[in-house]
Structures are given as C-alpha cells and as structure tokens.
C-alpha cells in the first residue's frame, strides 16, 4: 500500500555517454538501458548527424547495426543505431557501446539524415529501413528499394500495412 503523500524519486538513468553528450551541448534524452546493460539514448532527427559525428570523433568508429521498427498502429516509427568503439582491448575489457534511437511520427515527416558520409556500411542498412518502413534518408547516394520490387506500394513491415490481394510480377524481358 502506498501513501499518496510519498514522493516517488525516479532512478537516474543517464549514463556516461549521455552525460558526455549533455556536457558538450548535445540535446539527448537517456532511456532505460537495454537487456545487455548498454546505454540507450533518444535523439531528435535534426541532431542525429552531428551527434553521431561527435561520437565517432570520440572513438565510436563502427556502426554495428542500423534498423527500424514500428511501435504499432498510430504510434512512432523508430530508427535505431548501434555504435561501438572498435579498438584492440585487453581480454577482460569490453568495448564501449551505445544505442541511439530516433522516434518519428508515422503521420509526419519520416526523414532523417543519412549516416553514409560517416559510415559506408550504412548504405544497405538504410535502404532496408526505407524499403520496409518508409523512412527517407536525406543525403543517401542510392535512395531506392533494396528488397521489394521498385513498383511496390507501401511499407511491408509497418503494423498498419495492408497486404495487397494480388501482385503481378513484371517480366524482365
């Protein structure tokens, strides 16, 4: 039983990377760490490129993964980025890691800056996120579908996607 007059104090969830970003003037919102204990940070699409560039300059030199997911009908489309500091480490030391998340209103502007200029490995990962969720990556050199046919309508991994009854494959000849 709880007393209504008790003040609930939330546990501080910011970690060293979020604190470093805040101390250097980068807007961010720390989220609860993931199941592996890795720091998760929410950032705005407008700050993505500058924050990732700052993190890369601070040693996060490898984009392990970029992807997206749909929180559900009427909710956000989320782009996530897993960055790692790849250095030669002693056997008992783990590399620094961080997870960045950009939350996009599904009915708003689904545009984020491409990280291709910083990490060439973002190429096909961003194209897959575009292909499956409809997120546009501004500045991407090859902004076209990767998995679905070029004339496909819609974004198949969105939870509000309605699958067509019939799709006629076009003969390449």
From Swiss-Prot:
Catalytic activity: a plastoquinone + NADH + (n+1) H(+)(in) = a plastoquinol + NAD(+) + n H(+)(out); a plastoquinone + NADPH + (n+1) H(+)(in) = a plastoquinol + NADP(+) + n H(+)(out)
Membrane topology recorded in Swiss-Prot or TrEMBL: Peripheral membrane protein
MF-aspect GO terms: NADH dehydrogenase (ubiquinone) activity; quinone binding
Gene Ontology BP annotations: photosynthesis, light reaction
Subcellular location: Cellular thylakoid membrane
Keyword terms, alphabetized: Membrane, NAD, NADP, Plastoquinone, Quinone, Thylakoid, Translocase, Transport
Signal peptide residues on this chain, from the entry's feature table: none
GO terms under cellular component: plasma membrane-derived thylakoid membrane
The keyword NADP is annotated on this UniProt entry: yes
A Pfam family hit: Complex1_30kDa
Enzyme class: translocase
EC number: 7.1.1.-
Protein's UniProt keywords contain Phosphoprotein: no
Primary location: membrane
InterPro entries: NADH_DH_suC (IPR010218), NADH_quin_OxRdtase_su_C/D-like (IPR037232), NADH_UbQ_OxRdtase_30kDa_su (IPR001268), NADH_UbQ_OxRdtase_CS (IPR020396)
The family this protein is said to belong to: Belongs to the complex I 30 kDa subunit family.
Purpose: NDH-1 shuttles electrons from an unknown electron donor, via FMN and iron-sulfur (Fe-S) centers, to quinones in the respiratory and/or the photosynthetic chain. The immediate electron acceptor for the enzyme in this species is believed to be plastoquinone. Couples the redox reaction to proton translocation, and thus conserves the redox energy in a proton gradient. Cyanobacterial NDH-1 also plays a role in inorganic carbon-concentration.
Subunit structure comment from the entry: NDH-1 can be composed of about 15 different subunits; different subcomplexes with different compositions have been identified which probably have different functions.
PANTHER family listed in its UniProt record: NADH DEHYDROGENASE [UBIQUINONE] IRON-SULFUR PROTEIN 3, MITOCHONDRIAL (PTHR10884:SF14), NADH DEHYDROGENASE UBIQUINONE IRON-SULFUR PROTEIN 3 (PTHR10884)
Name of the molecule in the record: NAD(P)H-quinone oxidoreductase subunit J
């Amino acid at each position: 039983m709880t007393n209504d007059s008790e003040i609930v104090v939330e546990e501080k969830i910011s970690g060293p990377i979020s604190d470093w970003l805040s101390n250097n003037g980068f807007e961010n919102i720390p989220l609860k760490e993931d199941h592996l204990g890795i720091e998760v940070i929410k950032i705005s699409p407008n700050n993505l490129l500058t924050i990732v560039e700052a993190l890369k300059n601070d040693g996060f030199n490898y984009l392990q993964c970029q992807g997206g997911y749909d929180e559900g009908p009427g909710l956000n489309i989320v782009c996530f980025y897993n960055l790692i500091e790849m250095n030669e480490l002693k056997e008992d030391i783990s590399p620094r890691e961080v997870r960045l998340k950009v939350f996009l209103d599904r009915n708003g502007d689904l545009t984020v800056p491409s990280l291709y200029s910083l990490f060439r490995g973002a190429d096909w990962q961003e194209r897959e996120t575009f292909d499956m969720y409809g997120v546009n990556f501004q500045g991407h050199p090859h902004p076209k579908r990767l998995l679905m046919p070029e004339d496909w309508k819609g974004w198949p991994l969105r939870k509000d996607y309605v699958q067509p009854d019939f799709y006629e494959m076009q003969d390449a000849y």
